[in-house]
Amino acid sequence: MASTDSPRYSRIAITLHWLIALLIIGQLVGGKVMTNMGFSTLKFEIYQYHKSFGIMILLLSLFRLVWRLTHKAPALPETMLPWQKRVAHLSHKAFYILMIGIPLSGWAMVSASTLNIKTKLFKLIPWPHIPGITPSESLEKSLKNAHEWLAILAVSYTHLTLPTKA
């Protein structure tokens, strides 16, 4: 693990943080809009971009996790109580689980879809379905519910933890 005595996160960590945060906000808004639209070509296009940005979030989050595991985070303030430090560490872990779990559940849902619509990231890069997941209406429905509930959990969790300072 790269060691630093800096009281701040690195520029790369900060950039990843804000880039992923903005992408997630866009995904939440886009997800809400597209699920409330009637069937149309525009809805199909929004779904395709939603998948593209979701995979982008997944890849950036995995990179961010590797970066975090190989670069020491700044120490939490000494004024924080031990239980507050534990909560801060658990909160970070929960966010990583959600940043990776939500896109994975979406990718799995698309992979299980009986519609078998191919994914092309930003209309350019073919993206495969997850190997081993076969089309199934019941599995797709379960994964859709998981995807939506994880997103609701992420929004709720953010609202609960945003006022706290770690």
What are these regions, as identified by a protein language model?
Residues 46, 50, 100, 147:
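Conserved histidines in hydrophobic membrane contexts and catalytic metal-binding motifs
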Residues 2-63:
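Transmembrane alpha-helical insertion/packing segments
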Residues 108-132:
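Juxtamembrane non-transmembrane "cap" segments at the membrane-aqueous interface
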Residues 47, 77-91:
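Juxtamembrane helix-capping/reentrant segments at transmembrane boundaries
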Residues 158-164:
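Conserved small/polar residues in nucleotide/adenosyl-binding loops
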Residues 91-113:
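Hydrophobic alpha-helical membrane-insertion segments
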Residues 65-81:
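Membrane-helix interface/capping segments
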Residues 133-156:
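Hydrophobic alpha-helical transmembrane segments
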